[in-house]
Amino acid sequence: MKDIVPPPPPVVRNDVAAVQALFQQHVVPSYGRFDLVLSHGSGRYLYDITGRRFLDLGGGIAVSSLGHAHPAITEALVEQSRKVIHTSNFYYHEPQGRLAQALVSLIGPGKCFFGNSGVEANEGLFKLARKFGHDEGRFEVLTTINSFHGRTLAGIAATGQEKVKKGFEPMVPGFRQVPYNDLDAMRAAVSPATAAILIEGIQGEGGVTPARPDYLLGLRELCNEKKLLLFMDSVQCGHFRSGRFQSFQRILEGVPGGDAFLPDGISMAKSLGGGFPIGAFWVRAPYADLLGAGTHGTTYGGSPLACAVALKILDVIQREKLADNVRQVGAALKSGLEQLVHKYPSVLQTVRGLGLMLGLELAPNIARLPGDPSKTQAVRFANLLHGAGLLTIPAGAQILRFLPPLNLQASEAAEGLRILEEVVAPLAA
């Protein structure tokens, strides 16, 4: 047996290069990382190992629903870990049952399955579609161009972006993409092999583009007509990020027939655990028992610890009325971004999105933008914002996403807008 190797000594507090060297030597280089070494967080702020503070308007890509080091999450982690962390799904435990009950109450009649991530949730929906259509030879899932559904083999096959597929061909069969928000294209794509349609209520990686109300209602009608399952990928746009639990609920507010809209399956993750790994999919009642015993499973999914954390987050969101906060602060942030677009059209082009899921599109070919020209404008712009103390998330070559914690304060949104203008103004001069 190999001798046990003692852990290396901790890196000196402010030695950024030493930490980066650990990654270069020991971590698979599958991520393009920014030159920041973060050490801790508090509320809506993150700190690096040199002591610099950053306002986090990226939220770990829509994950940090309550910000950083929230006492309620810490309490839930400690309290549940003192009881039991993991049991396996051979046994019942209360937190999983209560969390499923809570999610069903927020969506509609159905049942939930729990995993560890968004892509696992989507994989569950893919298997559900195959099970649903199996006896008729239907297995195909239609998705949309510019969509993003994860990085497993099925996830990249479902994703409507060629960059994630390159080098991993041949693709898993059974997925085709059509333009987003184009009902005629989706209808034309349905074939005898089609079992389901999967879309995002708001495309995230594809540029923060919300679905149109008529598109959602038309898809439901199409699926009813063709006997297809309608799935929604709510991994990024769900969990109150739009101001309602599900983005389709917000998009269809006040729209005739909108209250009756319900998909057949929904994938969830990210904000659900606030940083603790958990994913889930909800299945509408008529199809909730398709995946019977032995057809699907996961070792860690729905552990007592993960479910206790998710329950506590839901409790805080509802008790502190954070859905209202998302609407109010999100509207102020969007308005502020639109004012900057109007003021600096040579740098900023458009704003889109709902609630606290906003996309800021940069103008093409910003002449004064510094940085490595081999990098996208979005990455170079994000680097400038880092230098000023603001974190955002690039989406594609031209878009910055704002995906902050749901408890972002109005004063913090104003601070973010001030920092953004400080960076933009010299570029427009």
Regions from the PLM with identified roles:
Residues 2-429:
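Conserved N-terminal phosphate-binding loop of PLP-dependent enzymes in the Aspartate aminotransferase
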